[in-house]
């Protein structure tokens, strides 16, 4: 079985999720396929998780690629951990509303910042879903772990029609 992580360069999210999955016996003999646009982060997360696999003497395997289609090829599960625009865009999500007197506690899921974030993420989420339908297992399951959570999930299910 293969699990593909889109945005695997989100080191904290990816490492935590994989460590949790590796605690489940059914997921210990699996292929984790990591995709990210940052080769540097991709290499780092792959090395960290490979070390976890080796230290625990598990049969899990790792693939890594900056080619999303390659990572999605044959995947049964796809986990989205992306932050479209990175931290620089997130800063704008906070600061632009603040210029107009809208002080939001967090700008990644609610209020004006969440809407801005959604406008960046939804088109890319829909692109991911099209690739999932083309390259992944026929009954693949898309698991969104990226904010704005509700907006991305809604787009994937209602517009892109993925599981």
Which residues fall in each region the model found?
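Short, surface-exposed basic-aromatic patches at helix termini and helix-loop junctions that form
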Residues: 23-26, 50-55, 80, 134, ...
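NAD(P)-binding Rossmann-fold cofactor-contacting core
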Residues: 26-52
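Rossmann-like NAD(P)-binding element
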Residues: 35-41, 56-135
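Short acidic, glycine/serine/threonine-rich loops at helix termini
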Residues: 16, 44, 90-92, 153-158
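Rossmann-like dinucleotide-binding core of oxidoreductases
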Residues: 126-163
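N-terminal Rossmann-like dinucleotide-binding module
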Residues: 3-32
């Amino acid at each position: 079985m293969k699990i593909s992580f889109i945005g695997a360069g989100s080191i904290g999210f990816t490492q935590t999720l994989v460590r949790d999955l590796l605690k489940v016996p059914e997921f210990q003999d699996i292929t984790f396929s990591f995709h990210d646009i940052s080769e540097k982060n991709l290499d780092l997360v792959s090395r960290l998780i490979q070390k976890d696999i080796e230290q625990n003497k598990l049969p899990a395997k790792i693939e890594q690629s900056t080619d999303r289609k390659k990572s999605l090829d044959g995947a049964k599960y796809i986990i989205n951990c992306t932050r479209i625009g990175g931290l620089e865009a997130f800063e704008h999500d906070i600061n632009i509303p603040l210029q107009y007197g809208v002080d939001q506690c967090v700008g990644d899921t609610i209020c004006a910042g969440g809407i801005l974030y959604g406008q960046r993420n939804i088109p890319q989420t829909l692109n991911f879903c099209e690739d999932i339908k083309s390259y992944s297992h026929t009954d693949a399951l898309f698991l969104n772990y990226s904010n704005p959570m509700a907006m991305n999930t809604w787009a994937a299910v209602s517009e892109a029609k993925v599981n």
